[in-house]
A protein has these predicted regions:
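Bacterial Sec-dependent N-terminal signal peptides
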Residues: 1-28
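Beta-lactamase-like hydrolase cores
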Residues: 26, 30-108, 114-121, 185-192, ...
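Second-shell loop/turn segments in exported
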Residues: 68-77, 115-124, 167-176, 186, ...
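Extracytoplasmic
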Residues: 97-99, 117-119, 125-128, 143-145, ...
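Active-site SXXK
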Residues: 110, 124-142, 201, 240-241, ...
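Active-site-adjacent, His/Asp/Glu-enriched structural segments that form or flank metal-binding
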Residues: 145-208, 217-224, 231
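A small/polar active-site loop signature that marks catalytic segments
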Residues: 232-368
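C-terminal soluble interaction/assembly domains
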Residues: 332-335, 339-446
Length: 446
């Protein structure tokens, strides 16, 4: 049979399908028989962009392939059209084997738009980071900074360029601490005219407790180490600092150890990073260490709680949940990143948190720019491209085995601002769950 005849037959088959089948056909299949100019073409992101999200826990790099179009019935209101579209999406056979908790809220009208199993307890994966981010901003404020401080005790002897005393490096669990900040510490010591230290280099680890991993983390995951002193996101700070001092001609007689700095210690320098800068990478790249660091900033409450624990953070999150009019005992908060298998939230909780953030400009104006943008950046860079949802949906993704989630904001076709949460559990293929979520977003945007 000639190619032209095959093409004609396939097109006839496609056009003969029921409307719902036409709407939800996979574009990879449609592209086989559409004219060449209509094929879906995808491009590989450059190496720099890939590196920028190298710590991403959304490990599935599969590109979207859903070709979605929706009719608009002029005899129905916008809300009735949206409800009809969403009801059709929820006829998907996917939901025969996969759980879905969904809530969609119209922020402009401050009314419920759609809900489905919104109170079903589900594992959120990395949309847990939305909970952590909003709780941290609510408790600490948008001007909060992560700190790493250097102190000394004893006497400075100018004639011998000696510190007759000790150095203390006080950790604040700053995940952005890199070589630039390390060099600043060394330069500050040199500026004091110190080339020799008769005492000890102490690491003050009192910012948090000694637990290095979160509850419910799988042993075979790429788990971050939870330490107050981080260098290049690793637990190698003191060794690297000691080495850097030696390289710059600064010697220490008694090596290094751990001890909390005394109240009479003198500050040499403090390096800082803003909560907004940390949050941007945490959300765009879905960085688990950054999220756990923010979880412990919340737990520490700006340094008020020494040896802060995950339970301290949970208490503050529970307080926020009560402010939303919900019962915190209905949820399980294990960690700040969503890595834990013990986290159980609902779509309702996530939406009410996003609504709360929107109603508080200090939170919303810091949170919104950190969210991945559909078809543009972060973990949404390959999703919903060439659709009305592209450059519109700003949302946090979540992916662990069996779980895919999406929560954030979008502007609907009627100009209304929407917040939403979609949590899928029990799926063997994350791509199918992502496409389900994409269709919901496109239905709202188109």
């Amino acid at each position: 049979m000639k190619i032209k005849q095959i093409t004609t037959l396939l097109l006839f088959t496609f056009l003969s399908l029921p409307l719902a089948a036409q709407v939800y056909l996979d574009s990879a299949e449609v592209a086989r028989f559409l004219p060449y100019k209509n094929k879906v073409v995808t491009t590989t992101q450059n190496a720099l962009e890939q590196d920028s999200i190298s710590s991403d826990d959304e490990t599935d790099d599969e590109v979207d392939s859903t070709l979605t179009a929706f009719d608009y019935d002029t005899h129905l209101s916008w809300k009735e059209n949206i409800t009809q579209r969403l009801n059709n999406i929820f006829q998907s056979p996917l939901l025969q084997t996969v759980q879905a908790g969904v809530m969609i809220w119209d922020l402009t009208d401050d009314t419920l738009l759609f809900q489905h199993n919104e109170q079903l307890h589900l594992r959120p994966a990395s949309t847990m980071k939305c909970v952590t981010a909003i709780a941290a901003l609510d408790k600490l404020g948008s001007s909060y900074t992560y700190k790493t401080s250097l102190y000394y005790t004893g006497n400075l002897v100018d004639s011998t360029q000696t510190l007759e005393g000790d150095l203390y490096i006080v950790g604040g669990m700053d995940p952005m601490f890199r070589a630039t900040e390390m060099n600043q510490l060394v330069a500050a010591i040199k500026n004091l005219g110190i080339n020799h230290i008769t005492g000890t280099l102490y690491a003050d680890l009192s910012f948090k407790d000694s637990k290095q991993f979160g509850r419910g983390w799988c042993w075979d995951d790429k788990n971050p180490t939870l330490t107050p002193l981080l260098y290049n996101k690793k637990d190698i700070f003191v060794e690297q600092f000691n080495q850097k001092l030696r390289q710059n001609g600064i010697t220490i007689d008694s090596g290094y150890g751990t001890r909390q700095y005394p109240s009479n210690a003198q500050n040499i320098i403090t390096t800082t990073h803003s909560i907004g800068d940390v949050m941007r990478h945490m959300m765009k790249a879905s960085d688990n260490l950054y999220a756990e660091s923010m979880f412990y900033q919340l737990a520490s409450n700006g340094g008020i709680n020494k040896h802060a624990s995950a339970n301290n953070a949970r208490i503050y999150i529970q307080q926020l949940i009560r402010k939303l009019g919900l019962n915190p005992s209905n949820y399980k908060i294990a960690d700040g990143s969503g890595l834990s298998l013990y986290n159980y939230l609902t779509a309702e909780l996530e939406v009410k948190l996003l609504r709360y953030a929107y109603q508080n400009p200090d939170i919303y104006n810091t949170l919104l720019p950190t969210l991945p943008i559909a078809g543009v950046d972060g973990t949404l860079r390959k999703r919903m491209r060439n659709t009305p949802a592209a450059r519109n949906v700003k949302a946090k993704t979540g992916t662990v085995v069996g779980v895919t989630s999406l929560a954030g904001y979008l502007t609907a076709a009627n100009g209304h601002l929407i917040c939403f949460s979609i949590i899928n559990n029990g799926g063997l293929a994350s791509g199918a769950m992502r496409n389900f979520q994409n269709k919901i977003c496109i239905a709202l945007c188109q």
